[in-house]
């Protein structure tokens, strides 16, 4: 493993993540970044717990993490990549689209999502695209491309 990747300096705590992203409870969906290459790649952890509000209605007898929240978790990891790029304007980057997102397996309370995002492109310093994947226990549960746009 590359020394720059193994350094604890390349990890981000939940407090540091709160400094990079505007999301707050109950929509802060990234607990820790375990690999961070600003402007290129991030690998993060989302611990899924039964105490999250979505499980009150999705579904009480068989709780499943909604797919849209898995995608949102991936988007937030992508946002961590983009917000650390010094040459981009500061502002609010929001979801602009998704391509080829596929859900492979259900995500349950007690699971730990490992989310990997790689920056694919930045255009006109306003639009970005990342490739995202989410795994549980080494199994792919969701993958796709996510697009972002800077809001004025």
Curated annotation (Swiss-Prot):
SUPFAM superfamilies: Thioesterase/thiol ester dehydrase-isomerase. Keywords: Cytoplasm, Lipid A biosynthesis, Lipid biosynthesis, Lipid metabolism, Lyase. GO terms for biological process: fatty acid biosynthetic process; lipid A biosynthetic process. GO terms for molecular function: (3R)-hydroxyacyl-[acyl-carrier-protein] dehydratase activity. Gene3D superfamilies: Hotdog Thioesterase. The active site is at residue 58. It is an enzyme of class 4 (lyase). NCBIfam families: fabZ (TIGR01750), PRK00006.1 (NF000582). Involved in unsaturated fatty acids biosynthesis. Catalyzes the dehydration of short chain beta-hydroxyacyl-ACPs and long chain saturated and unsaturated beta-hydroxyacyl-ACPs. PANTHER family: 3-HYDROXYACYL-[ACYL-CARRIER-PROTEIN] DEHYDRATASE. This is 3-hydroxyacyl-[acyl-carrier-protein] dehydratase FabZ. It comes from Prochlorococcus marinus (strain MIT 9312). The gene is fabZ.
